[in-house]
Amino acid sequence: MTYTRDYHNREFEAFSRAELASGGPDPQVKIIAEAITRLGGSDVEKTWRAGAFISAYTCGAAASIWAQLGWEDSSEMISAFLRMHGEYLPTRRERRTIWGADRVKWTKNLVSWSALAARVAEWKDLAYPALYDTISKNTTYFGRYATMKVIEVLHRAGVVAAGQTDIRPIGAKYPRRTLAWLFGYDIGTIDSDRNDDMALATVNAIAEDLKLKYAIESWFDFETLLCNYRQSLRGKYPGRSHDRELAHWRKAEPYWRPETQARWIPFYEIRAQLFPHEFLGEIGGWSGARPELEAALTRRHKGVVQHDTLIKKEREHGA
């Protein structure tokens, strides 16, 4: 069985509306931007905090790093801190690029970011393409999504003027493939090897109709929804990001003490303020991802996972 453009459009719309209603698609970005705004400080400090969060993708790690390290700290201090405490700094699998018991990659990442943060006055007013290039070229172990994500945090926190303005084609294989599903294109028609004007125009012309159709406010949210929809075919239910983040936060709490964590990121307070309470495990009584919801969504899309050629290839290669 081949799943059609109509099927994917219907399911993408249903998933996107539910994910947006939950406060997604990337609620951690909103939490961190709010926490940075509340803490105040200079643009350098705000920028450092944004990148420290991106290094691990969890609020629990961010609060701990913010409490113990600053942008002026030496690489030796950063390395010593990470080697001593890294086990209790939860990181998402998406940031496995900085994993390693010696913490060398994580140290390089934070050192490179602190150097860039110190010069934020030089680049904070750049237009999005130049801003993206500046961050991606000057930060070690920041890939495509990490660069997009830190720009979104800085934009929401009022540090940089530019938010995301397009879907950079290069490296965007998952959102690009979802666009191919939604429009019935072969993925080869959406170029993946360059970010020149023609490639950008092709991808963005395809995307703009959907972005407007579903009233999605930002390009960052739109691209994240494209990726999340693909993951929903394998069980990523609307609101799962909230559940995973709660589990990460609670992993860090016993080691760092709840009152210390909350002084830097009032996690539960911000979540209760920003998001519908029915999606929050600390209110509803669960403490992490809910397997029963993952299983239900996987069953719903069982045919897609079994029969869609692209999904099958990605599963075979562990994507």
Regions found by a protein language model. Give the residues of each.
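C-terminal accessory module of base-excision DNA glycosylases/AP lyases that mediates lesion recognition
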Residues: 1-39, 116, 120-131, 148, ...
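N-terminal polyanion-binding entry modules of DNA glycosylases/AP lyases
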Residues: 1-93, 317
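Helix-hairpin-helix/helix-loop-helix acidic hairpins
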Residues: 90-140
